[in-house]
């Protein structure tokens, strides 16, 4: 039986690392794809490389896509403040990057088709889609339809599947799965700030730290909030 190939979008964060590890557990040959898009938390790319090495991915590519050229997000524009007051239900936060996931998924599908990969692995989850429009199930469902129409493989009936195994999961459940799969949590990076250590106060740090505490591992929390 031929081994299935998957392309995993690998940000360097906990969620994408866990999703990639899940694909590996299913026996996939996994190719990692990361993006240098001008994010202020550039440290996550070092984390992505470390995760790819630890998991033993077949390949790992890092592509430059300068979304900071026009800003529009707290993650790409230093003039926009990183929020620290918690996730507001029903509000799209300033850390949303215009078109980011649309660009990333499109490029991922290109690599997947070039490599003959059956799946594109995405780490989006319930925490993400509560705030970000391009992490929600309805977005992924429609993008899947587009992918099937926009590629040679899709038109021939064997297009790449957008696989988002964490889409209904809480952050705590993701942390627990990461431990089960021996994901190097200490090597991942979630902080939105551009420092060399996690700030402990941005929304991403708060969510990650809360999940780690719920999972019984406060020792892995950021220094500022442990």
From Swiss-Prot:
GO MF terms, alphabetically ordered: ATP binding; ligase activity, forming carbon-nitrogen bonds; zinc ion binding
Lineage top rank: taxon: Bacteria
Pathway(s) it belongs to: Purine metabolism; 7-cyano-7-deazaguanine biosynthesis
Cofactor note: Binds 1 zinc ion per subunit.
Pfam assignment, any one: QueC
InterPro entries linked to this entry: QueC, Rossmann-like_a/b/a_fold
GO terms classed as biological process: queuosine biosynthetic process
Reactions catalysed according to its record: 7-carboxy-7-deazaguanine + NH4(+) + ATP = 7-cyano-7-deazaguanine + ADP + phosphate + H2O + H(+)
Positions that bind Zn(2+): 191, 199, 202, 205
Needed co-factor(s): Zn(2+)
The enzyme's E.C. designation: 6.3.4.20
HAMAP family linked: QueC
Family statement: Belongs to the QueC family.
Function of the protein: Catalyzes the ATP-dependent conversion of 7-carboxy-7-deazaguanine (CDG) to 7-cyano-7-deazaguanine (preQ(0)).
The protein, known as: 7-cyano-7-deazaguanine synthase
Originating organism: Parasynechococcus marenigrum (strain WH8102)
Designated gene of the protein: queC
């Amino acid at each position: 039986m031929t081994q299935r190939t998957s392309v995993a979008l690998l940000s360097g964060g906990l969620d994408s690392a866990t999703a990639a590890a899940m694909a590996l557990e299913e026996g996939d040959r996994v190719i990692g794809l990361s993006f240098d898009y001008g994010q202020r938390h550039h440290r996550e790319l070092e984390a992505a490389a470390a995760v790819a090495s630890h998991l033993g991915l077949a390949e790992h590519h890092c592509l430059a896509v300068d979304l900071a050229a026009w800003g529009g997000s707290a993650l790409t524009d230093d003039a926009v403040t990183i929020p620290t007051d918690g996730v507001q239900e029903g509000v799209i936060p300033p850390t949303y990057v215009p078109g980011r996931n649309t660009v990333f998924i499109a490029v991922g599908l290109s690599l997947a088709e070039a490599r003959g990969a059956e799946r594109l692995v995405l780490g989006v989850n319930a925490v993400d889609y509560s705030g970000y429009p391009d992490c929600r199930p309805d977005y992924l469902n429609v993008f899947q339809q587009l992918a099937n129409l926009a590629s040679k493989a899709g038109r021939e009936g064997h297009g790449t599947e957008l696989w988002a195994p964490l889409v209904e999961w809480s952050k705590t459940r993701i942390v627990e799965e990461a431990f089960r799969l021996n994901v190097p949590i200490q090597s991942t990076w979630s902080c939105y700030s551009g420092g060399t250590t996690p700030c402990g106060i941005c929304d991403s740090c708060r969510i990650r730290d809360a999940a780690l505490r719920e999972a019984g591992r406060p020792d892995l929390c950021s220094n500022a909030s442990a």
